[in-house]
């Protein structure tokens, strides 16, 4: 039964939900679907929603005259535009996404061949964490969408789901009002699905990288550990040669891990940098909004500002947290090469081990924009910067 479970190991299932979203929103053509029909479907969906939805928000922003309204609309517009840029980036890196899937198949096959229960458990744990992250983001987006709908329903006067400009009179035309709200609801649902995948696939890929590093760490620590099987019918020299071959296989596994990290770096560099820029801009805008509406005692607007501030802060924290986990695991992987039983081994074993240690001394990190490390230290610096800006704005007021 355990062997059957090992055979079913598929770490790419960590991004199963994301892949389905990308297929649904026109980025990845599902198998068996006509290429022409899918292109038409993709262009239609993305033209109607991905392009038109943020343009309507941007147009409304240009017609805003008061500072409080400008800050509120700017917060929503920045968030939506950056979310669409992250979504577009998925299309740009789709070749790398397919390469990751192929590489994961090789690494999964290796884990199944080794067949260690602890390795399999570590990989499945990271898959579950990645899928749980997607479900958490999905719950947040469902709650936000529902809250927007309830807000429109309970308001005594007419109001749109989001402040947008459509060039028609919807205040005095019931037909226009209903049609615009139907479009906004459809666009909001599609955008929420897109954003859910865009916000949760960086931590999902970081979980995959962490899981395979953990599996390799366990594999390396077992190198040179003599078992009852190795003690029976095997000479000491034959055992040492076998251990050397185990090291060579682990070095090949390490090369695959490094290759996976390089591809993930290319995939995550742009969206993570966009998220940092978006968070900084939204946090500063929310601070301005909070300061201006506080005098008007507009508690609803204050709550919305706090929600947006919390949301963008959470998005940065998540990628920094999982990036920090990956760095810690890379350090543990380096330590594993020190902890293996290298003392009894052949000279060529020790030579290969020294070369490998030289390559693993530097901890692995993913960099946003190839510059900003995804770590908890970075998150702390972002929070300090935000507090400094807020204090400066408060004094200026």
Swiss-Prot record:
The atypical heteromeric and topological design of the odorant receptors appears to be an insect-specific solution for odor recognition, making the OR/Orco complex an attractive target for the development of highly selective insect repellents to disrupt olfactory-mediated host-seeking behaviors of insect disease vectors. Odor-evoked OR currents are independent of known G-protein-coupled second messenger pathways. GO terms for biological process: detection of chemical stimulus involved in sensory perception of smell; sensory perception of smell; signal transduction. It is found in: Cell membrane. Belongs to the insect chemoreceptor superfamily. Heteromeric odorant receptor channel (TC 1.A.69) family. Or2a subfamily. This is Odorant receptor 2a. It is a multi-pass membrane protein. GO terms for molecular function: ionotropic olfactory receptor activity; odorant binding; olfactory receptor activity. Residues 60-72, 151-176, 294-301, 384-397 are extracellular. Expressed in 20 sensory neurons on the distal edge of the antenna. The keyword Protein biosynthesis does not apply. The chain crosses the membrane at residues 39-59, 73-92, 132-150, 177-197, 273-293, 302-322, 364-383. Keywords: Cell membrane, Membrane, Olfaction, Receptor, Sensory transduction, Transducer, Transmembrane, Transmembrane helix. It holds the Pfam family 7tm_6. Interacts with Orco. Complexes exist early in the endomembrane system in olfactory sensory neurons (OSNs), coupling these complexes to the conserved ciliary trafficking pathway. Residues 1-38, 93-131, 198-272, 323-363 are cytoplasmic.
